[in-house]
Amino acid sequence: MVISRAEIYWADLGPPSGSQPAKRRPVLVIQSDPYNASRLATVIAAVITSNTALAAMPGNVFLPATTTRLPRDSVVNVTAIVTLNKTDLTDRVGEVPASLMHEVDRGLRRVLDL
């Protein structure tokens, strides 16, 4: 499977545990393409939620369903970054346009103080 940055996939994040994201939900690949193309078995992603109220949180990015092919309007939660096995990514949903990825990158820089 060829995985690219800015793609959205469904992933099983496992059972709920504290405040960690869980269950089957969409994730946005944020790892760079050279790493995606490498022999690494893992991928870094940001969790996507349909709780659009989280768009008000600094750094989070609103994703319109019409732009991403998600079933409903959603939000990239830049504070919910996960490392997954590439095999945990199942159905490809779509891709985040460059303009919104720029906002995601800005949010990641903010939350990680880069």
UniProtKB/Swiss-Prot annotation:
| Effect of a null allele | Individual deletion of mazF3, mazF6 and mazF9 have little to no phenotype, but a triple mutant shows increased sensitivity to oxidative and antibiotic stress and starvation, decreased formation of persisters cells, and a decreased bacterial load and pathogenic damage in infected guinea pigs.
Query: Which Enzyme Commission numbers does its entry carry?
Result: 3.1.27.-
Its top-level enzyme class, in one word, is: hydrolase
Question: According to the record, what induces this protein's expression?
Answer: Strongly induced (17 to 25-fold) by nitrosative stress, starvation, when grown in a non-replicating state, in the presence of gentamycin or rifampicin.
Q: Where in the cell is it found?
A: Secreted
Per the record, its GO cellular-component terms are: extracellular region
- Which key words tag this protein in UniProt? Endonuclease, Hydrolase, Nuclease, Secreted, Toxin-antitoxin system
Q: Identify a single GO molecular function assigned to this protein.
A: RNA endonuclease activity
Keyword Hydrolase applies: yes
PANTHER family the UniProt entry points to:
ENDORIBONUCLEASE MAZF, ENDORIBONUCLEASE MAZF-RELATED
What is the annotated role of this protein in its UniProt record? Toxic component of a type II toxin-antitoxin (TA) system. Upon expression in E.coli and in M.smegmatis partially inhibits cell growth and colony formation; its toxic effect is neutralized by coexpression with cognate antitoxin MazE6. Acts as an mRNA interferase on ssRNA, cleaving between the second and third bases in the sequences CUCCU and UUCCU.
Name the UniProt record assigns to this protein:
Endoribonuclease MazF6
Q: What species was this sequence derived from?
A: Mycobacterium tuberculosis (strain ATCC 25618 / H37Rv)
Q: What is the lineage of its organism?
A: Bacteria, Bacillati, Actinomycetota, Actinomycetes, Mycobacteriales
